[in-house]
C-alpha cells in the first residue's frame, strides 16, 4: 500500500519543502515564491468577470484539496451595493461581464480584508470594449496595501500583453490559465503548512505514563531467540499494552474445549481468530468468527475454523485460536495505524481507514517519527477517513484525543524499539468513548548496531527525538538558578533578543561581524537543528518583573548559548559560545562549555575545537581554565585555535 515515493513526499513535507511534479508547476511555484508572499492558509477567494473560468478555478481548488474562500455575510452586505446588478457573491465573487476596473478593485480589497480568506485570485476574461490595462492597474494599486497573496490570471493572448507587463512590474504573479494560478497558490499553502512541520520540535518520549520498555524488549528478544521475525497476535498486543495502547483481552486456546471455557469466563459475545505465523490476512482463509454468544458455539467455531484453514492453506502452522472480547464497530470507526521501514528514511508511521478492504480503499497518510500532538493531528487530517471522525451517519464524533494518544504511543514504540520493521494495528476501533486495538501484526528484525557507543539508541530514525535527558537545573553564582537545555525552534525570538542586547564588542567577538541582530536565515539555522550532527544548549533564566498594574510577572530569557557542529571527519566538532553581558562572571560560560562537551562526548566525538579572536582575553582565559590547548591559527594570525580532547 505504501510506496517509496510516498515516503519521499513525507520526508520533503517534514523538511518544509514543496514538491512539484512538472516543469510548468516548477516555474509556477518559483514565480509565486519569488514574490515573497508571507505564507498563509489555504482558503482562496476567486474574483472573476467570467463565470466559466471562475468555475474551472473553483473545481481545481477542490481537486488539489484547497478551500474556496467565501466572503463573510458582513463583507457581502457591504460590497454587494457597489457591484454591477448581475454580480454574484455566494461562492465565487463573479462580478459579471459588466465589471470594470473599479469593481475589481473594490472586490479584491474587500476579499483581502475578510478573515475567511487567505489569498485572492483575480481572473480577467477580455470582453469587447473592456480595459484590461485599467483592471491590471487597479490590481497593482490594491496590491500595495495587501498583506495576503494576490495572484492574477489574464485570459487571452496579444490583447492582454500590456496588462501582463503592468502585473509583472507590480510583482503580481500572472498566469494564462485558471488551473495554473490555483496550483501556484496551492504551492504557497503547502509551503506554509510544511514550514509549520519544519518548526515542530521532535518530542521526547512521552511525559505521560511511563511505558514498560524493558518488558517490551524481553518479548522481542524471546521471539528473536526462537529465530522468528513475526510476532503472534498475543505477542503483538503485549507490545502495544506495554506502551499503554488499549487492546482487547486476548487468550490463546489450543483446543476446542479450551476455547469453550475461555469464552465462557470472558463473557459473551466473543470473537475467535486463527493464530498462525504463516497467515497475515486471517479473513482471507476464514480465520475470523465474530459475535459468538455461547460456549457451544465457541467450541464448534474452533473446530470448523481449524478444519477450514487447514483445507485452504495446508502448509500453514497453526498454534491454536485466540479468544477475545468483541469490540463493536457498529458506531465506531475502523482505523489502521501502521509502520513501514524505508531505505533510506527508516521507520514511517501510516494512518488511514482500516478493515478488511484497506488495499482497495488505499487510504494512507504518513509521517516520519517522532510525532508530537500537532504532527499527530495533521497526520489524521491528511487521511480520507478523517471526514468520518466527526458526527457521521447518526454516530457521535470520535474521541480525537484518544486517537492522537495512540499515534503518540506508536511513535514512542518506534523510537524506543529499533527492532520494529512492520506493524499493522488493524482494526483500531475508535468511538466517542476511546480507542481499542482489536488486531495487530508486528514484524521485527535484529537492530543494526550503528550507535557507535553513543548513549542513545535512535540511529534508526531519520529525525532524532528531542534530547530531554540533557535538561539540567544549575545554581547561579550569586544566587538563583538557571535551566540548561537543548534549543527549541520556538526559541528564535529569545535568541534574537539575546543578540540584540549584546554589546557591540560581544557581538563582534561571537560573530566576527558588526551585525546588530541575526538575519532570518541565520536565526532559522541556529534554532532548527537536527540534534544529531549539531547541538545547541541554551541557559534559560526566569526573570521576575513587576508590571504597571503591580502584578509580578515571570518571563523566560535566554542568557547564554553553547553549540557545536560536527566536522566532516565525523570524529571532531567545532564549538561556539556566547553569554549575555549582564550575566558574565556568574559561571554560565564554564557550565555551558562543560555541558556541550558532555553532549559531544556522549555522541562519540573525540575532539572539540574552536577559533577565538586573539584580542579576546576573557574567552582565552576561560578556555585555558577548562583545559583547552591554545595555539596560533596558521591561516590567520588574528585567531587562536583552541582544542580539547574528549
Sequence positions of predicted segments:
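Long, contiguous binding/interaction regions
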Residues: 446-646
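Gly-rich Lys/Arg/Thr-decorated short loops/hinges at beta-loop-alpha junctions or inter-strand turns
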Residues: 1-15, 82-94, 116, 121, ...
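ATP-dependent carboxylate activation and anion-phosphoryl transfer catalytic cores
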Residues: 2-10, 19, 133, 138, ...
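Long hydrophobic segments that form regular secondary structure
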Residues: 100-142, 241-244, 254-268
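Active-site nucleotide/adenylate-binding loops and adjacent lid/helix of ATP-dependent enzymes
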Residues: 24, 30-40, 208-333, 341-345, ...
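Short glycine-cluster motifs
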Residues: 13, 40-126, 134
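Peripheral docking tails and interdomain loops at the edges
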Residues: 1-48, 52, 58-69, 136-231, ...
Amino acid at each position: 500500500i505504501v510506496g517509496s515515493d510516498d515516503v519521499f513526499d513525507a520526508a520533503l513535507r517534514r523538511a518544509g519543502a514543496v514538491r512539484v511534479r512538472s516543469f510548468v508547476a516548477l516555474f509556477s511555484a518559483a514565480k509565486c515564491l519569488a514574490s515573497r508572499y508571507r505564507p498563509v492558509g489555504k482558503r482562496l477567494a476567486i474574483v472573476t468577470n467570467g463565470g466559466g473560468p471562475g468555475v474551472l478555478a473553483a473545481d481545481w481548488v477542490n481537486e488539489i484539496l484547497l478551500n474556496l474562500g467565501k466572503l463573510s455575510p458582513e463583507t457581502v452586505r457591504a460590497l454587494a451595493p457597489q457591484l454591477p446588478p448581475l454580480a454574484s457573491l455566494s461562492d465565487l465573487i463573479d462580478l459579471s461581464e459588466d465589471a470594470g476596473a473599479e469593481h475589481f478593485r473594490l472586490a479584491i480589497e474587500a476579499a483581502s480584508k475578510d478573515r475567511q480568506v487567505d489569498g485572492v485570485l483575480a481572473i480577467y476574461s477580455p470582453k469587447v470594449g473592456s480595459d484590461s490595462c485599467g483592471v491590471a492597474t487597479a490590481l497593482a494599486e490594491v496590491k500595495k496595501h495587501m498583506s495576503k497573496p494576490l495572484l492574477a490570471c489574464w485570459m487571452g493572448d496579444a490583447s492582454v500583453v500590456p496588462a501582463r507587463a503592468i502585473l509583472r512590474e507590480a510583482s503580481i504573479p500572472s498566469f494564462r490559465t485558471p488551473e495554473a494560478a490555483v496550483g501556484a497558490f496551492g504551492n504557497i499553502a503547502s509551503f506554509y503548512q510544511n514550514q509549520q512541520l519544519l518548526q515542530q520540535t521532535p518530542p521526547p518520549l512521552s511525559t505521560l505514563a511511563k511505558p514498560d520498555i524493558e518488558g517490551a524488549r524481553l518479548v522481542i528478544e524471546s521471539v528473536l531467540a526462537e529465530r522468528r521475525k513475526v510476532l503472534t497476535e498475543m505477542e503483538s498486543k503485549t507490545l502495544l499494552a506495554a506502551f499503554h495502547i488499549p487492546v482487547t483481552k486476548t487468550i490463546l486456546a489450543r483446543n476446542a474445549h479450551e476455547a469453550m471455557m475461555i469464552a465462557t469466563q470472558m463473557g459473551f459475545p466473543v470473537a475467535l481468530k486463527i493464530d498462525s505465523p504463516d497467515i497475515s490476512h486471517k479473513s482471507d482463509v476464514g480465520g475470523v468468527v465474530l459475535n459468538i454468544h455461547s460456549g457451544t458455539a465457541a467450541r464448534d467455531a474452533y473446530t470448523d475454523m481449524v478444519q477450514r484453514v487447514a483445507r485452504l492453506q495446508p502448509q500453514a502452522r497453526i498454534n491454536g485460536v485466540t479468544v477475545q472480547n468483541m469490540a463493536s464497530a457498529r458506531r465506531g470507526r475502523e482505523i489502521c495505524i501502521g509502520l513501514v521501514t524505508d531505505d533510506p528514511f527508516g521507520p514511517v508511521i501510516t494512518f488511514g481507514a482500516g478493515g478488511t478492504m484497506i488495499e482497495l480503499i488505499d487510504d494512507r497518510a504518513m509521517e516520519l517519527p517522532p510525532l508530537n500532538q500537532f504532527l499527530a493531528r495533521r497526520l489524521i487530517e491528511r487521511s480520507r477517513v478523517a471526514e468520518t471522525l466527526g458526527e457521521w451517519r447518526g454516530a457521535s464524533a470520535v474521541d480525537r484525543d484518544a486517537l492522537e494518544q495512540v499515534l503518540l504511543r506508536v511513535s514512542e514504540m518506534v523510537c524506543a524499539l529499533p527492532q520494529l520493521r512492520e506493524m499493522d494495528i488493524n482494526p483500531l476501533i475508535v468511538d466517542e468513548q476511546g480507542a481499542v486495538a482489536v488486531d495487530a501484526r508486528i514484524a521485527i528484525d535484529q537492530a543494526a548496531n550503528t550507535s557507535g557507543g553513543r548513549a542513545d539508541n535512535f540511529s534508526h530514525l531519520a529525525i532524532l527525538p528531542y534530547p530531554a535527558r540533557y535538561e539540567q537545573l544549575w545554581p547561579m553564582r550569586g544566587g538563583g538558578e538557571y535551566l540548561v537545555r537543548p534549543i527549541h525552534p520556538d526559541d528564535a525570538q529569545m535568541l534574537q533578543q539575546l543578540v540584540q542586547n549584546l554589546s557591540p564588542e560581544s557581538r563582534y567577538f561571537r560573530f566576527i561581524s558588526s551585525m546588530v541582530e541575526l538575519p532570518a536565515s541565520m536565526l532559522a539555522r541556529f534554532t532548527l537543528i537536527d540534534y544529531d550532527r549539531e547541538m545547541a544548549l541554551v541557559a534559560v533564566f526566569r526573570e521576575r518583573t513587576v508590571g504597571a498594574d503591580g502584578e509580578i510577572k515571570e518571563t523566560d530569557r535566554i542568557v547564554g548559548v553553547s553549540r557545536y557542529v560536527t566536522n566532516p571527519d565525523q570524529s571532531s566538532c567545532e564549538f561556539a559560545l556566547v553569554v549575555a553581558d549582564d550575566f558574565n562572571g556568574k559561571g554560565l560560560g564554564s557550565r555551558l562549555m562543560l555541558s556541550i562537551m558532555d553532549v559531544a562526548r556522549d555522541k562519540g566525538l573525540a575532539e572539540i575545537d574552536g577559533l577565538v579572536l586573539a584580542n579576546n582575553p576573557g574567552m582565552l582565559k576561560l578556555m585555558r581554565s577548562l583545559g583547552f590547548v591554545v595555539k596560533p591559527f596558521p591561516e590567520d594570525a588574528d585567531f587562536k585555535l583552541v582544542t580539547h580532547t574528549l
